Amino acid sequence: MKLAQVRETHLLAGEWDILATLAFEEEPVDPRERLLDLVTGKIRKMPFVRDTNTIVPAMSRTREAHLAHPERRAYAFVFIDAKMGKGQEVMNHVMRYDEVVESHLLLGKSDVLAVLEFEKGIIPPVPERAAKIVTEEIAKISDITNTETLCPIRSIVKD
C-alpha cells in the first residue's frame, strides 16, 4: 500500500524497525484527527505492522539547504534528553551544526529530535560520522543529559 502522506521511510536495526515521516499536502483543519485516522486506519492495518509509535513535535526548526540529490543523502536521528525546562534552548542550539538539518521539540520520552544529514560515502562510514558529531559536539552541550542515535541501514525519500 502506498500512502501519499509518507514522505520518508528509514530502515533501522534495533528497538525500531522503520522510522517514517508523514506530511499532509494542505493544512488540515485538525491535523491530529487526520494523523490518527492515517495511523490507526491505514498504517496499523498494513501486513507485518505489529506496533507503531507516533511522535508529533510541539515545535520544529528546519534548514532550507538540504543536500541537492536525495539519492546521495544519508541520515542519523538523535533523540536528546535535556535538563528540565531546557528543551527549546537545546533544540535551537543543535541547529548551529551544519549536519543538523531539522530539530524538533518533543513532548514525551525525549525532549528533542535532531535530524542529521550527510553525503553518502564509505570513508568514513555514516555511523562513524554521526558518532563523531554526536559525541564531540552535541552531547557536550551543557543542557543535554543523554542522547540516543539511530542510523538507518537504508532510506527512501520522496522529493
Ranges and model annotations:
Residues M1-D159:
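A compositional/biophysical signature of low hydrophobicity enriched in polar/charged and small residues
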